[in-house]
């Protein structure tokens, strides 16, 4: 998380790391209730503009039923891919935009000049205005 936090802060973004992000509960960063509470806290915090997932994983599906109403009431960009696509589908079903984009894990394992990382930055800052097929 330190590497990803550093990248985001270098973009002049404020970063809040959820309470249980670095915890361990089996294969997950916390129990279902802990992860649900972290996610809800981010959704209801007016200072939080987007939720950038740290990594994908099957644990995302555990949150779907509990977040259905929260996502609709407090729309924010949910950013990630892989198993995070389950959260994207929930967002779309509630009319909320989300971003299929790099997660924290990839901000640190990919070079800062990675095209997807740069597109994410441009989208977050409203600078990305073109969608086209890549060569």
Located regions from the model:
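ATP/NTP phosphate-donor binding region
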Residues: 1-47
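Structural motif
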Residues: 14-16, 49-50, 76-77, 96-99
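Short, charged, surface-exposed secondary-structure boundary motifs
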Residues: 27, 87-91, 108-114
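N-terminal active-site wall of soluble small-molecule enzyme domains
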Residues: 35-39, 60-66
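N-terminal glycine-rich "phosphate-gripper" loop used for MgATP/nucleotide binding
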Residues: 52-61, 81
């Amino acid at each position: 998380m330190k590497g990803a936090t550093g990248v985001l802060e270098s973009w002049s973004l404020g970063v809040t790391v959820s309470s249980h992000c670095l915890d361990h509960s089996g294969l997950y960063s916390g129990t279902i209730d802990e992860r649900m509470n972290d996610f809800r806290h981010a959704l209801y915090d007016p200072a939080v503009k987007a939720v950038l997932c740290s990594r994908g994983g099957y644990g995302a599906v555990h949150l779907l039923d509990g977040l259905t109403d929260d996502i609709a009431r407090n729309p924010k960009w949910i950013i990630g891919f892989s198993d995070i696509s389950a959260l994207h589908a929930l967002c779309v079903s509630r009319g909320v935009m989300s971003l299929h984009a790099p997660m924290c894990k990839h901000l640190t394992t990919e070079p800062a000049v990675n095209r997807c990382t740069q597109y994410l930055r441009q989208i977050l800052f409203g600078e990305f205005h073109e969608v086209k097929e890549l060569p």
